[in-house]
Regions:
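Short, well-formed alpha-helical segments that are part of the catalytic scaffolds
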Residues: 19-32
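A conserved acidic beta->alpha catalytic loop
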Residues: 45-54, 74, 98
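Glycine-rich, basic loop-to-helix element that forms the pyrophosphate-binding segment
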Residues: 72-89, 111
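Short aromatic/hydrophobic "clamp" motif used to bind/position activated sugar donors
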Residues: 94
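Catalytic core of nucleotide-sugar-dependent glycosyltransferases
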Residues: 154-155, 197-198, 221-229, 234-264, ...
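Membrane-interface aromatic/basic loop that binds lipid-linked glycans or pyrophosphate carriers
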Residues: 275-340
Length: 340
């Protein structure tokens, strides 16, 4: 697609599933953007079972020149939903916002498209953001961005992107990136983007954009990132967390092997992930998950760390396993009392 063929300069991807309480807020925050260039919203509802679909259909009827609602299909999952939307985008640049998050700066798109138009070597621009507690409505900072220069050589960010565990180096819902670079990367290696065993859609996009050029940063808050309810990445269920951590780390491992990235930092990261998986398996007392940790060690080509080996000894016998679970329960109870 050449520049003259772009119907809209910007495409905004919105994924949603069972978010009837928040999707209106999300769409309104995008529709109120003040931008000198046209933009579209590509809306992907993943077969919601509540009223989300009806709300999306209503918005698509009210704003037919802006919102394109993807066809209703059986549950795709977040990966296929995202990249189906991406391939449907008609814009030169792509932004996105999840169906429970929302933008808080009406000039977000204007600021970002201006940077991309004026800096052809910049592949992605992103901003600062805040956590938003759905219950209390309070906002909290995610911490300092380690790459806070106006423009950074993306190659300097690769290792940090691969090994991120807490604050994402680039929060994709704050970002805008070049569609042509993304489409080429997708065509060159569709496995990186469509493999269901990788579990997320954003890390690989951020990596590719950093690998292919410079990253611009705007130190202004444009996004409130919702939390306070269970999601794929936020769950108190140890089994669900085990699966999520395993899949996202599979992606990091694939990227490291594909792009020949190997350092003490990446090795330590994979070891820490093995320990994290071990503890998830320990807490939910699941022998199958425990065995899967060794499979991950082999796949990621990393030795199980000493602290995980100690946990393995405890978990080798159900008597000791149950005993240490009981001891842990006591300590957790004491910590809870002390916090009051």
């Amino acid at each position: 697609m050449t520049p003259s063929q772009y119907k809209n300069l910007i495409s905004v991807i919105v994924l949603t599933y069972n978010e009837e309480k928040t999707i209106t807020r999300t769409l309104d925050s995008i529709l109120c953007q003040k931008c000198h260039v046209p933009f579209e919203i590509v809306l992907g509802d993943d077969c919601s079972t509540d009223n989300t679909r009806k709300i999306c259909e209503d918005y698509a009827r009210r704003f037919p020149n802006i919102i394109r609602l993807m066809e209703k299909t059986p549950n795709k999952g977040v990966i296929d939903n995202y990249f189906d939307c991406l391939l449907a985008c008609q814009g030169k640049y792509i932004a996105d916002c999840a169906g429970d998050d929302f933008w808080v700066d009406p000039l977000k798109l204007e600021k970002e498209v201006t940077i991309l138009e004026n800096n052809p070597d910049v592949t992605l621009v992103h901003t600062d953001w805040m956590y938003y507690d759905e219950e209390t409505k309070a906002t909290t900072s995610p911490g300092t961005n380690p790459f806070n220069s106006d423009i950074t050589d993306g190659r300097k960010m690769l290792e940090a992107i691969i090994t991120q565990t807490k604050r994402p180096i680039i929060h994709l819902c704050t970002a805008m990136y070049r569609a042509d670079i993304m489409r080429k990367a997708y065509n060159d290696d569709p496995k990186m983007f469509r493999n269901k065993d990788f579990g997320c859609e954003d890390l690989q996009i951020c990596f590719i954009m950093a690998y292919m050029g410079k990253i611009a940063y705007i130190p202004k808050i444009t996004l409130y990132y919702s939390y306070g309810r269970e999601t794929v990445s936020f769950s108190n269920n140890d089994k669900k967390q085990f699966i999520f951590v395993k899949k996202t780390t599979n992606l990091s491992s694939y990227i490291c092997k594909t792009y020949n990235i190997n350092s003490q930092t990446t090795y330590k990261y994979f070891q820490n992930r093995l320990f994290g998986l071990t503890m998830h398996a320990f807490r939910c007392k699941d022998k199958h998950l425990h065995r899967m940790v060794q499979d991950c060690s082999n796949d990621w080509q990393v030795q199980i760390p000493t602290k995980a080996k100690i946990a393995n000894v405890i978990m080798s016998n159900m008597l000791t396993w149950n005993l240490f679970l009981y001891i842990r329960k006591i300590f957790v109870g004491i910590k809870h009392i002390l916090r009051k």
